[in-house]
Amino acid sequence: MSKSVALLLLCACLASGRHVPTRARRQAGSFTVNSDGTSGAALKVPLTGNDKNVLSAIGSADFNDRHKLSAASAGLALDNVNGHGLSLTGTRIPGFGEQLGVAGKVNLFHNNNHDLSAKAFAIRNSPSAIPNAPNFNTLGGGVDYMFKQKVGASLSAAHSDVINRNDYSAGGKLNLFRSPSSSLDFNAGFKKFDTPFYRSSWEPNVGFSFSKFF
């Protein structure tokens, strides 16, 4: 992603005039288990900030259905009290190579009942573990909706150049338990991809996510 696009996302995070103090989120960590046997863990540690913006260190690890590491990421995230955000991450994928990604989120609407956000991301893929494989880019975006912090839905799509692959996903979330310090969610969704040579069917997946806040 170009520097101008990254700066535009950063400005969107910082320039909003709406101030909703309850929107500030300080997530310490989360753990997810999926129906296909995969799992993941994520950690966010605030480094510095004020009453409007918080800069955090972030990290995550994903595991396959044999409980072996399938991806590890680390980076920085900037969160705004109005629900906007920007992140920069580096990812190592065993058997593939590395990824460098930037992502942005802009909150479009928020009140006591509804929360709607748009997101976009760009990833530079470097398949160093695959001989003679070229680097390529993945660009994508989507929308997230939440009703009363209880029921949510999301849609996203992404396109990878060189390999000419398109990915699509649709999902829903149901909050089962929430307290000031923790949250338990049930997730369900479908995903598919297509290339010039093959198109997958919609594949279902369900899982549970537990988050701890501080």
Swiss-Prot record:
Pfam families per record: Attacin_C (PF03769), Attacin_N (PF03768)
One GO location term (cellular component): extracellular region
Coiled-coil portions: none
GO annotation, biological process: defense response to bacterium; innate immune response
Tissues where the protein occurs: Highest expression in fat body and hemocytes and to a much lesser extent in Malpighian tubules, silk gland and midgut.
Record keywords: Antibiotic, Antimicrobial, Cleavage on pair of basic residues, Immunity, Innate immunity, Secreted, Signal
Function description: Hemolymph antibacterial protein. Has a wide spectrum of activity against both Gram-positive and Gram-negative bacteria.
Protein name: Attacin
Source organism (scientific name): Bombyx mori (Silk moth)
Source species taxonomy: Eukaryota, Metazoa, Ecdysozoa, Arthropoda, Hexapoda
